[in-house]
């Protein structure tokens, strides 16, 4: 979906709500998952209505995911709390494809890495309302000025936007700068957004539209990563090509770029927390760059031991997962794929690794052959460090 289409439907919503909604959508699309949409406006209105919407019920104190190997509990590692709910109301996290083989944009993880520990972070931008918080005014302004320098442009004026608190106006959530032909916004959660007035034309040799092939998309993304290399700061740009279909079978791309880094763990972290997405209009012009940096205000808690993908699969089948889908996991035969990555929502108190399972939902099968794959999360951290390991009963409050 194009930025201008969203704008028409959502121009009256609070900035903080819109930012978190857009952030969630971009994050899930990057991994090949998107929020299943009923309509353009309804896709985002769940954020407004979530306090009243029916949310998936989680039954606590699920089975202890004890690894088969001996367990030594490190007292220096604090217990972690999983999010109570993953959205609800107007949709759920899933992807619509004709076949799982079309899934793209997945994590750089693979089982051959044989990872035994991964870092966990306290989310410094944690906010149950989804409003950007975390960095102070000076740090936000510093990032804004650095972005302007990277774009070789001069800031003409700035606007300050403040978050809301129960007692009134809160700290600065966003600073927006006006420059020649563009607007640059820096957020308290570390994000940067650049909007080009009227769209920035690309060389004619590049095709930057939803109906572009993977090869055409690769070419334009590498071009954009090079053109805006100072802004991105990526030493080894890697592509995450993804997208999904509408109910009628129209394909929409949702590609992104991240830094491959110097190791597999660094690649997974950058893929999950530090990535760039480029948005075009119907003419194939660049209208927006969105650069995420969710670890900008996070604090590392330590490296936690993790389970294997096979152990996670066992937990999935036993019901120890969290999901925004309104269906109980239908069974082992419907598990279509798995990847290891981090969730990066501002409504998560901790950033920890999960095994993200793509599960075919037979209830959502369509006559035109499209299948919906719901996303089911199993925490990768040993269960002994999870304070509220869940079991989802498929019901609603």
Q: Where is each model-derived feature located?
A:
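A short, surface-exposed beta-strand/turn
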Residues: 184-201, 265-293, 363-397
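Generic recognition of cysteine residues
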Residues: 7, 35-38, 44, 275, ...
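Preferential activation on post-signal-peptide N-terminal prodomains/segments
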Residues: 57-232, 239-247, 251-268, 273, ...
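Disordered, charged N-terminal biogenesis/targeting segments of membrane/secreted proteins
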Residues: 1-31
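Segments that shape or occlude catalytic/ligand-binding pockets
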Residues: 220-355, 359-366, 370-371
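Internal signal-anchor transmembrane helix that establishes type II topology
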Residues: 29-56
């Amino acid at each position: 979906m194009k930025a201008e289409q969203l704008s028409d439907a959502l121009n009256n919503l609070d900035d903080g709500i819109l930012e978190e909604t857009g952030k969630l959508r971009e994050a899930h699309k990057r991994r090949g998952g998107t929020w299943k949409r009923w309509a353009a406006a309804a896709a985002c209105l769940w954020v407004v209505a979530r306090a009243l919407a029916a949310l998936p019920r989680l039954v606590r104190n699920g089975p202890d995911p004890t690894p088969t190997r001996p367990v030594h509990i490190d007292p220096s590692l604090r217990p972690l709390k999983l999010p109570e709910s993953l959205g609800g109301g107007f949709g759920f996290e899933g992807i619509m494809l004709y076949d799982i083989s079309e899934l793209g944009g997945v994590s750089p993880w693979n089982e051959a890495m044989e990872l035994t520990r991964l870092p966990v972070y306290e989310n410094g931008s944690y906010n149950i309302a989804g409003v950007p918080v975390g960095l102070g005014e000076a740090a936000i302004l510093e990032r804004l000025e650095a972005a302007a320098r990277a774009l070789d442009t001069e800031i003409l004026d700035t606007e300050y936007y403040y978050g809301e608190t129960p007692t009134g106006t809160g700290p600065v959530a966003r600073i927006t700068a006006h420059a020649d032909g563009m607007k640059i916004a820096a957020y308290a959660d570390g994000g940067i957004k650049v909007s080009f007035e009227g769209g920035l034309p690309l060389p004619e040799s590049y095709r930057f539209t939803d109906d572009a092939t993977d090869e055409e998309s690769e070419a334009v993304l590498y071009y954009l990563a090079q053109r805006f290399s100072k802004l991105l700061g990526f030493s080894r740009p890697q592509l995450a090509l993804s997208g999904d279909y509408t109910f009628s079978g129209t394909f929409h791309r949702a590609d992104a770029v991240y830094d491959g880094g110097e190791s597999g763990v660094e690649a997974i972290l950058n893929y999950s927390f530090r990535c760039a997405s480029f948005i075009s209009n119907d003419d194939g012009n660049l209208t927006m760059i969105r650069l995420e940096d969710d670890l900008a205000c996070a604090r590392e808690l330590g490296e936690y031991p993790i389970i294997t993908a096979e152990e996670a699969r066992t937990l999935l089948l036993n019901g120890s997962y969290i999901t925004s889908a309104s269906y109980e996991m239908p069974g082992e035969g419907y598990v279509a794929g798995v990847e290891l990555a981090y969730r990066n929502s501002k409504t998560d108190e901790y950033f920890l690794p999960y095994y993200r399972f793509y599960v075919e939902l037979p209830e959502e099968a369509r006559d035109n052959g499209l299948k919906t794959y719901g996303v089911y999360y199993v925490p990768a951290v040993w269960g002994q460090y999870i304070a509220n390991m869940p079991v989802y009963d498929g019901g609603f409050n």
